[in-house]
Amino acid sequence: LLADRFTQKSLLDELNLSTSPWCLLKDKNQWTEVFKNVGEKVVVKRRTGGYDGRGQWIITESNQNDITDDLFGEVIAEKFIPFDYEVSIVGARFKNGEKRFYPVTHNLQQNGILRYSVTDISFPQQESQQIQAESMLGKIMDKLEYVGVMAMECFVVGDKLLINELAPRVHNSGHWTQLGCAISQFELHLRALLDLPTPSLQPIAPSVMVNLIGTEHNPQWLNTPFSQLHWYGKEVRPGRKLGHINITHPDKTVIIQQLEKLRHELPEAVSYTHLRA
């Protein structure tokens, strides 16, 4: 059900949960209706597969022919949302219906790929976003009678969350829990499946997860204090997630200092100074 964006978005509409306006794109004769009712700029996404920016196109009237005939019926069109930033939440539902949630995590994407995730319960709007996200994801898991870990990605627009996508599994944006929480998302998934007692999920300290993308392994990463390296052992390819580094510390200034040192050892430098907010 959730592997198909058509049935996933249909579920969100059925539950009356906020998401971007959308439609199933069946044939090229729909374009006039799409631009009128969905939006003047839309994001066309494959119904199945496609991730990290693959299988997605930003379409306006000027480039609608980029969607070739073989794609119709296999894609949906969503309104392009000029969001403020992106967040996600990872939670789990147990067999008895109980649920546990991690704090909402802030995410930075570059070229459609998650670069890093930041968790800090002192962020502005954190409390209101947490309430919204838990309610939305909880309704979805209850409707599906789901057992295990599920992630929900959202756009933030003002003080509202719009659901972007659901992932019925452990999630890249939840990797920070391996160092920043007493119970990781992997352990939480097992606890839910085995119906084991589980306390509330309290973060140890502010945390950042940095994805290692399209780069060879660098032993110097191990010199980063207050960190934990996870290397996947995959073949190195451009744009491929090959590992990640978690950094956790009570003082955000310390985290930023380590990130600034670390970014010079990565192929695509990212500025972390805005994390001071």
Q: Predicted regions: what is each one?
A:
Residues 203-206, 210-237:
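Glycine-rich active-site loop/lid that clamps phosphate-bearing ligands
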Residues 256-264:
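Short amphipathic alpha-helices in soluble, non-transmembrane regions
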Residues 2-88, 92-140, 263:
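Active-site nucleotide/adenylate-binding loops and adjacent lid/helix of ATP-dependent enzymes
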Residues 238-249:
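An anion-binding loop in the catalytic cleft
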Residues 273-277:
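Conserved small/polar residues in nucleotide/adenosyl-binding loops
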Residues 131-152, 157, 168-215:
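Active-site "cap" helix and flanking loop/linker of ATP-utilizing ligase/carboxylase catalytic domains
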Residues 100, 150, 161-165:
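Protein kinase-like catalytic core scaffold
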Residues 59-61, 93, 212-214, 247-250:
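Short beta-strand-to-loop capping motifs
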